[in-house]
């Protein structure tokens, strides 16, 4: 999972992720922004569920993050509909709307993001 941190002309941090993990970048850009307390909450949840059968999720404005003992899933809230609403032959998966990654990989990105932001 490759990533890049940039600053736009206003100084806002932007995250770009490799193909297949774009939604992780969108989550940072839309939900985290400068809210490092959200990252505190996510890291605490990851420690709580790691190695267990439990899971944790937090719905944001645009994206929901879901963590279990091994992986992290981030999905666009627009995917939050029942199967009855889906047209036949349609799939929930959309690279722009859903991403899965290992918990350790995700936590490495969180740590790198914190480091980048602190270098303001």
Swiss-Prot record:
Q: What is the lineage of its organism?
A: Bacteria, Pseudomonadati, Pseudomonadota, Gammaproteobacteria, Enterobacterales
* Pfam families per UniProt: UPF0231
UniProt similarity note? Belongs to the UPF0231 family.
**What name has this protein been given in UniProt?**
UPF0231 protein YacL
